[in-house]
């Protein structure tokens, strides 16, 4: 396994810290008026998403994590395990609910997702794009009559997620949604 020193920790580098994969969020060189220089490093744990602040000496070494990202197509689920197919090797990848929970509202068969693997085990999954096109299955008018903001209503989408949409959106129309914020972007058709 490859090693790197504190001064080689660049933003985005994936390393092993406390036997878990982490990504470097920031690395600041500090030269105090008195004493030895050091690095103030901020890491994000890739398994539990917690931020870690660490002070390192120049001589501190870290192992580079074997984290790879692959593009895979969602195939099917049995409600316990979600099955994806690697687009390059055509191997099946099995993802458990605790890993897939953040992308469940946007999960559609035959769509591509980016899966991060650490030691050949999935640790995270994201939609391959920041935007997704979904079909409006049902709309619920704004329940508060006389409300100041009556420019939006709730819409149930074909993945089961409910979001706010403009009042002109009808059942059966296709809309573009931002997967990061769960917000309506535009009407497609």
Swiss-Prot record:
PROSITE patterns: EFP. This is Elongation factor P. Involved in peptide bond synthesis. Alleviates ribosome stalling that occurs when 3 or more consecutive Pro residues or the sequence PPG is present in a protein, possibly by augmenting the peptidyl transferase activity of the ribosome. Modification of Lys-34 is required for alleviation. InterPro entries: Elong-fact-P_C, NA-bd_OB-fold, Rib_uL2_dom2, Transl_elong_fac_P/YeiP, Transl_elong_KOW-like, Transl_elong_P/YeiP_cen, Transl_elong_P/YeiP_CS, Transl_elongation_fac_P. Keywords: Cytoplasm, Elongation factor, Hydroxylation, Protein biosynthesis. GO terms for biological process: peptide biosynthetic process. GO terms for molecular function: translation elongation factor activity. Its main location: cytoplasm. PANTHER family: ELONGATION FACTOR P, ELONGATION FACTOR P (EF-P) FAMILY PROTEIN. SUPFAM superfamilies: Nucleic acid-binding proteins, Translation proteins SH3-like domain. GO terms for cellular component: cytoplasm. It comes from Buchnera aphidicola subsp. Baizongia pistaciae (strain Bp). Gene3D superfamilies: 2.30.30.30, Nucleic acid-binding proteins. May be beta-lysylated on the epsilon-amino group of Lys-34 by the combined action of EpmA and EpmB, and then hydroxylated on the C5 position of the same residue by EpmC (if this protein is present). Lysylation is critical for the stimulatory effect of EF-P on peptide-bond formation. The lysylation moiety may extend toward the peptidyltransferase center and stabilize the terminal 3-CCA end of the tRNA. Hydroxylation of the C5 position on Lys-34 may allow additional potential stabilizing hydrogen-bond interactions with the P-tRNA. The modification N6-(3,6-diaminohexanoyl)-5-hydroxylysine is found at residue 34. Pfam families: EFP (PF01132), EFP_N (PF08207), Elong-fact-P_C (PF09285).
